[in-house]
Structures are given as C-alpha cells and as structure tokens.
C-alpha cells in the first residue's frame, strides 16, 4: 500500500515537490517575461515621447535661427542649444534602438551572460563545476574539446592541472578507487571512507587530545602499525629503501604500500588519504594549496553533503605530512559539530593533535566545570543578530586552564577547535596569537557585518582563512561582502566603497524605470564583481560530482485543518487583534506567529495556561491535522523498516510531537534540540546512526539541521516550513549525503489554504530567484510589490485540493475576480476539461484563488509534462547552475529581478550602442579601481586593535540615495 493510499482517509493531498517547484518556477518565468516586455514597452513609449519633444524643440530652434528677425548674437546661442539637443536626440535614438532590439529578440541564448563567454571560457567553467580543475586553472595546455564520457579523455584533460599522481587510471575518475587497500575496506557501493571498520580501530575517536596521554597512545599505535607495514614492504624489496627513511618522523614518510599525489611546491597528499578521496575532493585540496601559496583565503561553498569537512581535514593533514605545518590551525564551528571534527581528524590522520577548547573537552580540569559553562557555550542564534546576548565570562580557574590549553597547542601542536561563543569568551587568549590557518565551519553565521561574532572573527591573526558553508550567499550583497572581507580582507574594498561602486549601481539597474545606461552599467558591475570573487569561491553540486548518490524524492503533503483548528484560525482572522494588525497598530509578525501555531497545534497558542490546566489533555493528536498524518506515516514506515528524521522549528512543537509518539506501538524515538547538552549531541547522532533500535529522531531545524550527518535515516519529515528556504534545505540534506546507501524520501507537511502554504509559495519563489541566470528578465521587484495582507486569508474548507495543488494539476488556470463568489472572496473557475481530467475537483465547484499569485500577476499555469526521469535533473541543473552561477547569485542577492536582453555583438555601424557600452564599461572599471585603491595587501597581519577592516571601525559618511546616483549617471552622459 502506498503512502498516498494509506493517508487518503485523512484527506491528504500529495504532490511531488520537484515537479511542483519546476512547474511554479516555469510559470513565474513566463509571467516575468511578460512583465519585462510590458516594462520595455512603457520604456519605449517614454523614449519616443522624449524624442518627439526634442525633435519639436529642434524644429523651433531651426525656425528661429532661419528667421530674419533673430539677431546674430542670439543665433549663435541658439546654435549651441541646437547642438546639445541633437546630442540628446542621438542618445535617445540609441536607447530606442536598444529597446526595440530587446523586444524583437526573444532568443534567450543571445542574452548577456551566455553569449558573452567564449567556448574556451565555457569549457573551463564546466571543468570547474564538475570538480576537474580549480578556478585558478585555465585551458592553456588542456584539450579544448573533451569527451567527458571517455575516461582517457578526462585523464588527458586534467593531468596537467592536478599534479603528479603515481597510481594508475582508476584514481583519475570522478569516483574513489574500489581497490582493497588493506586498511579501509570498501565495496563497490561504498561512497564514504569513514566506515565502521575504521572507527572501531580508533577507540579514542570521540575523545580529543586535551588529555596528552590519549594523543600519545594513539600516535604510538599509528606509528608502530605504519612502521610494521614499512618493514614488511622493505623486507620484500631486499631492504632497498630502508636507509633512506632512517631518522625521520613517521608522519613525514610516504605510506609503505599506497602512493600519494604531489603538487608543485612540494605539497603531497599522503597515500593514507589520497586513494579514498573523490576526484572533486582532490581538486578542492589542490585549490586550498593554491590559496595557501598566495597567502589568501576562500569560501568552500559545495552543496551540503559533499564532504567539506573531509576536504579541510585532508588539506591540513597533507600540510603536516609535507612538513609545512608551521603554526597551529584554529577551527571555529557550532558546538554540535566539535566531536565530528575530532572524529574526522583522528580517522584520517592520527598524528595531528586535536584539542577542544570547550567545557565538553577531555582536558583533566574541563569536566569539573562542564555544567557551569555549557550554558555559556551553547549555540544560540544570538551570533546572527545585531545585538548579541552578553555571555558570562569564564571563572579564573577555568580561564587558567584555557590559557594552558591554548599554550599547549602552540608548543605541542596542532589543531584547536572551539565554538563561535568560545571565540568571544576566550578572545583574549585566541586573538592576540598568530595562527597558521583558520576555518569557520557553517561560516554564514558571520554574514552580518555588525554582529559581535563577525567582528571577533575578523580579528583572528592569519592570512589563511577559509569559510565552509553550503549556503554561502543567502540574502544581499552586504552579506557577500562580509564573508569575503573575512577570507580575503580588502578584496572587495571597504563596505562604503563596495556599496557605492557595486551595490548601488547593480540595484538601480534592476528598477523598472532604469535607463538603458543604468541597465548595462548594472550588468557590467555584476560581471566585474563575479570576476573578483569567482576564483575564491568554490561551489560544486551533487548532481555534477556525486552521480552515484542514491535517489532522493521530495513530496509535499497538504493536510486538512481539524474543525477545532479551522475555528481557531477563523476566530483570529475575525478578531480584534487582526484588525489592529491591518490598521498598523500591531506587529504583523505577531499575527503570523499565532496562525503558524494554530496550523501546528491549537494548544500552542495558549500553551502556558493549558499546560497546567487540570484534567486537560494537552497536545491531543486528534486536534492537529498534521499530527494525525505523522502518526499514520510513522506507523506505516515502522512496518516497512524505514527510519525517520522529524524536524520542527520549535521545541514546544517537539514536546507535542513527543506526546503523539509515546502511545504508538513499537515506535522508539530519541530527541535533540537546543536544550540538549552539547556533550551529548554527537553521542546521540552516532547512536542513532549505528543503533537501529530507534525509529524516529526528533530534531529542531536549527540544531539538528546544521552540518550533522544522519545517514542512518532514509525518511525525512519537515513538520513546518521556514521563511528561509536554506534552513529547510539544511535539514533535508542531513540524510541525503555521502555515506547514504538507501533511497531517501523527504516529506513536507503543510495545512492547505493557510499561511503555511503561502510561506511555501514564497520559499519556492525565493529559491527560484536565487537560482536565476542572468538571461531571465527582472524578477524580484515584481514580487516585492506584494504586501503581507494576503497571508491573512483561509482557503475554503469545501474545496477539494489546494491552491498549490491546483497550480500543479491544471493544464491552464485563469485567475480572475468572480463577482458572484462566496463570501465576497475572489475565486477562479476550473476549466471543464480539468474537472473531467482530474477527479480531485468536483463538478460545479470553484476553488479559492490565491491572492498571492493574483497580486503577482500570474495569469495562467501550464501543466508540467515531465520528460524521462534520467534527464530531468541534469537538464535542470545545467540551466540553473550553469557557467554563470556566481553572477546569478550576485544579482539574486542584490534584490535584482535580472538583467534585460541585449545583443552581445554590436555592429560597427551602431555607434550609439557602442557609446552606451563604453559608458557602462567605464563605470564598471571605475568601480574596480575604487575597490582596488582601498584593498590592503593580504600578506599584512593587522593586529586586532589596528584592523581597519573590522565593521564599525570606519562608518560610512552617509547613505547615498538613488537620486544622487541617478544625478551622477546623468552627468556622466
């Protein structure tokens, strides 16, 4: 029995999420193209009106110049005015020609950002995207035409950029070797090296090296084992190389039986590690080495689940093996991930001494004060806010212990791991010292330039700074600037200069009333910005580099409100609080929060009262439509042998979910949220992955959805959607990642017709806008024009299906106002052919229209007809994550809809277009020069108190308005 059939009695409507989102985004693209065309028509009318006005002025001036009554001195003045008007006319006619070309040219392949690239550049970006070369490599010396299906062609194309590798062809493929190397057993389907056989050998994997005895025991065992293998190999070779290795430390010697890979500069990936890395991971290690040689930093923005942690561990281990690990490395990460980092270092390269500066560390004195400081070091969201919660400082005794711990890292090596909160608490111990390397895991936490943690991180004294983030660009250009200002100080100039020269021109170019010069200037500035950051931002996607991952499917389950939920929802919409919100007397977010609680469970609204009410069944599952679905799903999956991750946004909802799970027969669960002791979090994760006793793992999205590896589950449920699509994406990627052996199914639950469905619509569109390529018309401003009032509506209970479901199922759906609609609501008619084709709609019924989509102006929906499944994902990937993905992110994060179509090759006779192009290029080059003049050398180590790069140390003189910039552009013209 399928899930859909099993839940049919609950009124659940299921839609495949991938197809749904593709259908919605395709419709949005059509709408945006239509809106862009309308804007161009209005722009053309405006230009033609101005041309007519200027021509009329020229005609009048000609008449007055030709008149016998006009004095000679006055005629000279008129001729000067006439010359200016003719120049203006020439510029306006140039704009008119550009606009007409854009209107006539509907071939997206001619849009800027596609045709602007040469074949060589496209091939280079394809190699970078698929993890075969680094961004610093060009195609000189590579084969210009590579058949990527041919193994020998791949080897021929990448061999000159990847260094010397002593193994044979299988290691140049996009997959790791399936050869049995003796130490780490693998089968053909294994995709992740950290298998149980390895972790069982490393008995101290979960214990860091704050206790020096632990480190010594592990190091001695590793050296003895390696030396024994070397002696065996030397004996078989008649002691051929035995004298060569005498007197050297074991970690500096090559592996006895497995070959490493050496790059230019004496950097070698040891044989202990290299055979177990994927092709794209080796490329990342090479890229990190290239950054290290430049004394620059970068952002590893690989998609979640591709092993960003492994790539850093491999690089630092290779530095140590190559004898280039001169100063200790600092790793800052969320508290939940500290033990994971320790485990990976111990598994991949035992000689590295890894110390945790945290109350959960294994130092002899840390345990005495563990309870006292766990609350101080908890990973709250305060780091992302502008006003951080003031953390309580460490006691004098613990501070002395921390000081000795940091000192030991500098005297005995090698890695210090702490949290973002710990960086602030122990800043006086960490910030004054010079570090060899610094890594910020989940580095998007410092995206706010004014936050305290961002300021602290920028004071770390090292030039080798790396950010790990699966979602490096989320909202706007200021956040992008702040991330780059950490990894490469001065690369994008100071914040005021960056906003002046890049952010404002790019933003203005996206306005509907932007002139032709402003549109092209925005494009040129964005191209310049892309070129500045692309070598230092490495982002690869699973679909491009990890094709052997199990399948992942996503379903959206639309659940009906229970009668109690619907009554509570309607009562709030008709209540006094709602009127205050609509009148602006109360915060709109208050109403949103109440409605979201009702959608989850009505008891959450008055939780404090009902929780202590006598004889009241708090959290009764029968009161929540989604909770009834959860219980049915988990019962079914228990029978089928599936294990589930169940995510919710709040701990209060987890409490109710826990109540609903307790009376389910034979369903065992564990739980982790913000209140879970940090010392227990990794143990909970490991226990769930290894122990199949637990069927369900209850998690909050913020704690359990951040960097945690939960491949023990193959089902994921997102109980309630988040405004930020990257938050839900982080959660759903916990199971679908390297190491997963089963197909993964993700279910989103939402109540039909409520605020949750509208939040989901905004998620789809926000993700759609983030993934747009430059060729698409201006999209974001259209959606920004909608207000939040449409959130406070409720779909008709009698309607079968949902607003989103209708969008997906209808072959065409026209939104229009129906004067005879019930209750005065706006409605839509479902075409008769749809009612016949889809049984979900009853004859004669009308479905409530979405005010969201009507305000957005979506006129119709085309039914999505999926092609062959094997080609769907790849084709979509190529279109949305193609060669201009970095430029795409820049425009999306700036709040731009997109640029307009332009002819990329101008004819020589079109002098007006050449002038516009020249002016746009000049403005972009001026922006580049301005940024470069404020860039400080990356080699310079700035003490914390002298750093001019820290946000807040130099404030902008004042905001520059749009009118000011428009005036400047007018003067330039």
UniProtKB/Swiss-Prot annotation:
GO terms for cellular component: cytosol; nucleus. Its EC number is 3.6.4.-. Residues 230-251, 367-386, 803-846, 863-882, 930-973 are annotated as: Disordered. It is found in: Cytoplasm; Nucleus. PROSITE patterns: HELICASE_ATP_BIND_1 (PS51192), HELICASE_CTER (PS51194). Residues 868-882, 947-965 have a biased composition (Polar residues). Pfam families: Helicase_C, SNF2-rel_dom. GO terms for biological process: transcription-coupled nucleotide-excision repair. A motif (DEAH box) lies at residues 441-444. Residues 238-251 have a biased composition (Basic and acidic residues). Residues 35-107 form a coiled coil. Keywords: ATP-binding, Coiled coil, Cytoplasm, Helicase, Hydrolase, Nucleotide-binding, Nucleus. Residues 834-846 have a biased composition (Basic residues). PANTHER family: DNA EXCISION REPAIR PROTEIN ERCC-6-RELATED, SNF2/RAD54 FAMILY MEMBER. Involved in transcription-coupled repair (TCR). This is DNA repair protein rhp26. It comes from Schizosaccharomyces pombe (strain 972 / ATCC 24843) (Fission yeast). The lineage of its organism: Eukaryota, Fungi, Dikarya, Ascomycota, Taphrinomycotina. The gene is rhp26.
